[in-house]
């Protein structure tokens, strides 16, 4: 609770972070990202032009740029000790779900359970992404999917557990997109090329037209 109270003070004047969202103090939130009401962000980072829908929870997750995350998603679920006497976090975490603090320092390494969400990722409503999963750039996670393993760049996955349905583009186009890394280009460059982002079924020729200077 202390982390959330400090987070409230830290992000109080971020106009795109809802007053009714809970964000821990140690989270890193871009001023150009948006967190909607009743969402929870715990020890996570969110980069520019990404948004988190209402009632979505992020735990130990890093979210890239231009990501669209719908409502009621669970990303990076809390982990529990399976090989100890007890699975309760009261024995291993200073701040935990019980609201009681029995120890002065965490005894488990949370960093190994981080979820990595790439850039330009779309995550549908009610999707769940388990801990220690990496979602590649440009991927799409279908509504209600439960993602238990890594998702490749530009893959479309759905189902329980989530499986690859298809890829958004041809291998040639995907490789070119990964070379360009358009999400790292300056805003003025993207605005100059906005017509290309409004076109369906892009080709290598279209991508080669992107003005990067």
Which residues make up each language-model segment?
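Beta-rich strand-turn-strand
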Residues: 127-139, 145-148
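Conserved G/P- and acidic residue-centered "switch" motifs that form tight phosphate/ATP-binding loops
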Residues: 141, 159
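Glycine-centered loop/turn positions within well-structured domains
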Residues: 83, 149, 153-155, 163
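Catalytic-loop signature of eukaryotic-like protein kinases
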Residues: 120, 138, 155
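Flexible, glycine/small-residue-enriched loop-and-beta-strand segment within the central core
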Residues: 34, 41-133
């Amino acid at each position: 609770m202390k982390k959330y109270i400090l987070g409230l003070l830290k992000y109080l004047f971020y106009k795109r972070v809802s007053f009714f969202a809970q964000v821990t103090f140690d989270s890193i939130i871009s001023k150009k990202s948006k967190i909607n009401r009743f969402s929870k962000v715990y020890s996570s980072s969110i980069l520019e032009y990404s948004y988190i829908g209402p009632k979505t929870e992020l735990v130990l997750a890093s979210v890239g740029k231009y990501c669209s995350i719908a409502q009621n998603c669970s990303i990076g679920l809390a982990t529990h000790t399976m090989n100890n006497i007890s699975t309760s976090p009261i024995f291993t975490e200073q701040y935990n779900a019980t609201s009681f603090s029995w120890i002065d320092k965490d005894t488990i390494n949370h960093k190994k359970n981080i979820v990595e969400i790439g850039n330009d990722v779309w995550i549908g409503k009610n999707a769940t992404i388990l801990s220690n999963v990496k979602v590649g750039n440009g991927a799409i996670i279908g509504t209600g999917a439960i993602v238990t393993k890594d998702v490749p760049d530009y893959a479309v996955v759905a189902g329980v557990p989530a499986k690859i349905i298809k890829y958004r583009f041809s291998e040639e186009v995907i490789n070119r997109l990964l070379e360009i890394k358009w999400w790292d280009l300056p805003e003025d460059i993207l605005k100059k090329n906005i017509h290309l982002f409004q076109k369906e079924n892009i080709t290598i020729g279209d991508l080669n037209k992107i003005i990067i200077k």
